[in-house]
Structure formats: C-alpha cells, structure tokens
Regions:
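Extended two-metal-dependent nuclease catalytic cores across DNA- and RNA-processing enzymes
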Residues: 2-5, 9, 15, 54, ...
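Domain-level signal for Mg2+-assisted phosphodiester chemistry and nucleotide/NA-binding surfaces
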Residues: 2-107
Length: 215
C-alpha cells in the first residue's frame, strides 16, 4: 500500500494517525536475540493502532542523513566505530537482523504505508507529517518510538509511546519526564548535545546544569 504526501489524508481518514519509528522498534527483537520477528512486528503495530484508535498506520524508515553530515561531518561517527569493533559473529547477526527488517518492511507494505526517502531520516518524515496534521485531516497522532528526540514534536495533538519503557509522553504528563517546559526542549538539547548521535553540547554543561541555566 503506497501513499504519497500529496494524497495523505484524502479521502478523509478514519480515527487517529500512528507513526512508527521503523528501525527503532525492530531493535526490540534484536536485543532479545530474535532474528525472525516480522510477524510479531506487524502484530505489535496493529495492536498499538487499535489501542490508540488509529485508522492509518505509517512506518518510517531511515534513508540516510547526508544533509546533517554536511553540517556536522562527525554526526553519528561514533556508531561506525562501534560497528567496526564487532566480532565476525556479531557482524553476521547484525546483517541477518537488517535483512529481517527489510523483510518486515516488505510485509508491512501489503497493508500499510512505509515511507523511506534517500537522505532523509525517519524522524524527519515524522516531523513533516506531525507538523501538518490539519493539512492531512488527522485529529491526533501517536508516535511509536523509544527515541526521546521525537519529544521535540509533542504538542496538544501529538504524543509518543515507548515500547521500551511502556510509557506515554504527552503535553499533559510532560513534567513527569522533564524538569523544564516543553517549549525549552530545543534549548536543552543545544546545551547538552546528543552523545548517541555524536553531537557536542556546551562543554561542562550536563542535564542538571542545563536546567539551571534555563530557569
């Protein structure tokens, strides 16, 4: 099933929208050592859609991040170093995992929309759609990801559920997850950086200090 941005939301959708962070969710099975997970993945996604009254499911997949690397060549360079240290067995298992993820996307395409564009990351796709919910005629959107960077997109119509913590993050419980206001999220990330993506912050400024500076 294929939907372009131009046709998304036409005809008027039924229910809410579910945006799935494709690879992020797949790592749930990798961490469990499961390499045959495509059917479990599909069932999980459809179960979540039912829970959140989502009539439309969109699975987003990474297509690279060339424009980010053009700005910061060191972006995610730490991950290459990590993979370079893999043993032959780990390399084999990772290749098998990625192959199964590809099979999973193929399976999901039979019933749902899978969006992947060259040079665009999954969260870029999620950002574009979630910021244009009215244009696409959706009332609410639930993002499925354990990546807290996606919290930048949260507003009164957009929320996130983590399959790792099994917790929801919304505008209504924001203060249960963070010690600063929702509109200060970008400032917080600029101050602290992102170790996972190898993005530096202000030297000597950790999360606690960042919150103090924003008060």
């Amino acid at each position: 099933m294929a939907i372009s941005f131009s046709s998304l939301g036409d005809p008027a959708p039924i229910g809410n929208l579910l945006i799935v962070d494709g690879l992020n969710i797949a790592f749930r099975w990798k961490h469990q050592g499961v390499l045959d997970f495509k059917y479990d993945y599909a069932r999980t996604v459809e179960s979540l859609a039912k829970s959140y009254n989502a009539g439309t499911i969109i699975i987003t997949a990474d297509g690279g991040s060339s424009y980010r690397k053009a700005i910061l060549p060191e972006y995610k360079a730490n991950r290459k170093e990590k993979y370079a240290e893999q043993t032959p067995q780990e390399e084999k298992e990772f290749a098998m995992f990625m192959a199964e993820f590809s099979n999973t996307l193929t399976l999901l395409k039979e019933k749902h929309t899978v969006l992947q564009f060259k040079g665009v990351e999954a969260d870029d796709i999620a950002a574009y759609i979630s910021m244009n919910l009215d244009k696409f005629n959706f009332d609410e959107c639930w993002m499925i990801s354990s990546d807290r960077d996606w919290d930048l997109l949260i507003n009164d119509k957009v929320s996130r559920f983590s399959t790792v913590t099994r917790k929801e993050t919304t505008v209504h419980n924001w203060d249960e997850h963070y010690d600063f206001e929702i509109e200060d999220y970008i400032t917080f990330k600029c101050l602290t950086g992102d170790k996972g993506d190898n993005v530096p912050g202000i030297p000597g400024v950790g999360p606690k200090r960042a919150v103090q500076l924003m008060e």
